Regions:
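Short, well-ordered beta-strand micro-motif
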Residues: 156-160, 241, 299, 385
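Beta-strand-turn-beta hairpins that frame and shape the catalytic cleft
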Residues: 152, 162-164, 243-247, 300-307
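Active-site-adjacent helix-turn-beta-strand microarchitecture at beta-sheet edges
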Residues: 201-287
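Solvent-exposed loop/turn segments at secondary-structure junctions
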Residues: 163-164, 200-204, 255-257, 304, ...
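Short glycine-rich loop/turn motifs
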Residues: 151-156, 236-237, 292-297, 381
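Structural recognition of the beta-strand scaffold that forms the well-ordered cores
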Residues: 193-197, 239-241, 248-249, 299, ...
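Zymogen propeptides
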Residues: 4-24, 31-232
Length: 388
């Protein structure tokens, strides 16, 4: 008996029996899946690295703020409190009482309330220390010099005639609905030949550098009182202004309008602390842990020449300067009265380059280097300006 073949017949063409053919499988492109995995892993690693850096930074900050060294804590606290973009950080690691005790520690040893105007005898033809004419190469009456320290680069602007220095304002009528202006725009509006940032200002309760709308504290401009409300932040007290005899008056406290009228103030604003008064150094400021920050200060020599100091913003080669650094520079340049102005991301010095000292003649040049995080100078309501 023969065995029956149970294997199915082979049909090489299934479609001929009415069955549907299966579509051929698409081949995956080599590398497409690999690229996706690489991208995902890259961002995963990047996110992990950023998270680890943030955690490490928080641990390091906590160690400094709450560690065994009060001096390191105070320096870091003051370095972070002054710039508007970082002043919120110390509050994350310290209670309000400790924070207040650090920032209000700088009580002055100076005994006078105001500087003595009789100390200044204006002599626009005097030299700083020798018989040579220091203005021989400065036909517009403005000299620039630079000074470097271990942690900072500073720019010094000396103005021969104090009567040309005035307080410029971003508007005739300050309002939180009117943003401030940038100093390079303000110098064009005023037709001035030089300028630096001036006093404290309010940013509508934000840290947005685009606002800079209204000042904090008394403001006088060209003989008129422009603002009387508020006071500088972080417990800062002080006033700097020129009277109608073109003498710089520095005060240890924020002036009232009545006091300013009595002192015949023509241009001035609130900020501090006073660094030098009547030739005497403010030792509390000099020896304080004021932190490394970009800084601006205004001072006057005995002959009436006005000295502005502007320390670069934070970047490679310049962490910033302390009050001590600024005082040392002012003393070196013969200043007898000086006051600290707003600093941090506000610190800036500009000059209409009349003779092409820094670039193309006639253009407005930014003399200092402000923060790397800023594309342009921030908006502000007040500026020290130099008229032509």
């Amino acid at each position: 008996m023969s065995k029956r073949n149970t294997m199915p017949d082979y049909d090489p063409v299934p479609s001929q029996r009415g069955g549907a053919s299966k579509p051929p499988k698409k081949k995956k492109k080599k590398g497409s899946g690999l690229f996706g995995r690489i991208v995902r892993r890259f961002f995963l690693v990047l996110f992990t690295v950023i998270a680890l850096i943030l955690v490490a930074a928080c641990l390091a900050l906590n160690l400094i703020f709450n560690g065994p060294s009060p001096a390191a804590r105070d320096v870091l606290t003051m370095s972070l409190l002054e710039p508007s973009g970082t002043k919120w950080i110390p509050g994350l690691f310290m209670d309000a009482e400790t924070l207040d005790s650090i920032r209000t520690r700088e009580d002055s040893n100076l005994t006078d309330e105001f500087s003595n105007t009789s100390e200044i005898v204006i002599n626009k033809d005097a030299a700083i220390s020798t018989g040579t004419d220091e203005w021989a190469n400065s036909p517009d009456g403005i000299r620039f010099e630079s000074h470097s320290g271990d942690t900072y680069n500073a720019h010094i602007m000396i103005v021969r005639d104090p009567s040309k220095v005035y307080l410029g304002t971003s508007t005739e009528n300050f309002s939180t609905s009117i943003p401030g202006t940038r100093i390079d725009d303000q110098i064009e509006t005023d037709g001035a030949i030089a300028g630096v940032n001036a006093g404290a200002f309010f940013d509508n309760g934000t840290s947005d550098p685009s606002v800079g709308s209204v000042p904090e504290g008394l403001v006088y401009s060209k003989g008129a009182c422009k603002w009387t409300t508020g006071s500088p932040p972080n417990g800062i007290k002080g006033f700097a202004g020129f009277n109608k005899d073109n003498i710089l008056v520095v005060a240890q406290d924020n002036l009232s309008k009545a006091q300013a009228e009595e002192l015949n103030i023509r241009d001035g604003c609130c900020f501090g602390p006073v660094l030098i008064m009547n030739g005497e150094i403010n030792q509390e400021a000099y020896n304080s842990n004021s932190g490394w920050n970009p800084r601006t200060a205004v001072g006057q020599r005995k002959d009436g020449a006005v000295v502005f100091v502007c320390i670069d913003g934070r970047q490679a080669g310049s962490m910033g300067g302390t009050y001590k650094d600024v005082i040392d520079i002012m003393i070196e340049y013969g200043v007898v009265n000086a006051c600290n102005m707003d600093g941090g991301s506000s610190s800036i010095m500009v000059y209409r380059d009349t003779y092409g000292l820094f670039g193309e003649a006639g253009t407005v040049q930014v003399i200092n280097s402000y923060s790397l995080l800023q594309e342009r100078p921030r908006k502000m309501p007040t500026f020290w300006m130099v008229a032509p």
